[in-house]
């Protein structure tokens, strides 16, 4: 079973913020397929659905970002999901808006949600899709920036990015060939 995790902070005030882009991608996939996060357990909202005949576990942690691993690890353990079947979607300050990077494994890169997942799983050997949100300008702090909603102009770009990342997930579920998916979906979204 594949496991798709979108990272974000819970609560209405965090909807459509830069830090919640992982939630946005998972929500897009769920809505497109008429799925819903119908279970809550282990500090997470989740569902198990079939896509292309395969079971897929979708998770959104119901913790704050820096505690994401406290939801992801127990749910994966409960359903016997191996880290190599995990893909985490999250915001990345080091990528410009409109860029998407898929990686087979790697460090947290300073992202507290990823640090928590790596710590709780005991490995960084899992797939991830990093979604560029750019860096703050005009002296804005990083926390203020990532908790800021996208402007209307930015949302035009980010809607394309959300759809692009969702297609990458769908392609991986269909083919199980993440290396091919990386080749097709890495880069700037037009």
Curated annotation (Swiss-Prot):
Principal subcellular localization: cytoplasm
Recorded superkingdom: Bacteria
Top-level EC class: hydrolase
Site (Stabilizes the basic form of H active site to accept a proton): 91
Gene Ontology CC entries for this record: cytoplasm
Annotated InterPro entries: Pept_tRNA_hydro, Pept_tRNA_hydro_CS, Pept_tRNA_hydro_sf
Catalytic activity from the UniProt record: an N-acyl-L-alpha-aminoacyl-tRNA + H2O = an N-acyl-L-amino acid + a tRNA + H(+)
Keyword RNA-binding recorded: yes
Family: Belongs to the PTH family.
Protein name: Peptidyl-tRNA hydrolase
Organism, scientific name: Staphylococcus aureus (strain NCTC 8325 / PS 47)
Upper lineage: Bacteria, Bacillati, Bacillota, Bacilli, Bacillales
């Amino acid at each position: 079973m594949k496991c798709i995790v979108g990272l974000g902070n819970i609560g209405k005030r965090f909807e459509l913020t830069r830090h919640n882009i992982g939630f946005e991608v998972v929500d897009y996939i769920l809505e497109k397929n008429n799925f819903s996060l119908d279970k809550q357990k282990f500090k997470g909202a989740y569902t198990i659905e079939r896509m292309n005949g395969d079971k897929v576990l979708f998770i959104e942690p119901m913790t704050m970002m820096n505690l994401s691993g406290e939801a992801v690890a127990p749910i994966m353990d409960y359903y016997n999901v191996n880290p190599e079947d995990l893909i985490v979607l999250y915001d990345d300050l080091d990528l410009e808006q409109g860029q998407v990077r898929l990686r087979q494994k790697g460090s947290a890169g300073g992202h507290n949600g990823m640090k928590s997942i790596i710590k709780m799983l005991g490995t960084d050997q899992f797939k991830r899709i990093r979604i560029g949100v750019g860096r703050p300008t005009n002296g804005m702090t990083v926390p203020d920036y990532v908790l800021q909603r996208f402007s209307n102009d930015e949302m035009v770009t980010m809607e394309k990015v959300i759809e692009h990342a969702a297609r990458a997930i769908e392609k991986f579920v269909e083919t199980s060939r993440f290396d091919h998916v990386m080749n097709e979906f890495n880069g700037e979204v037009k």
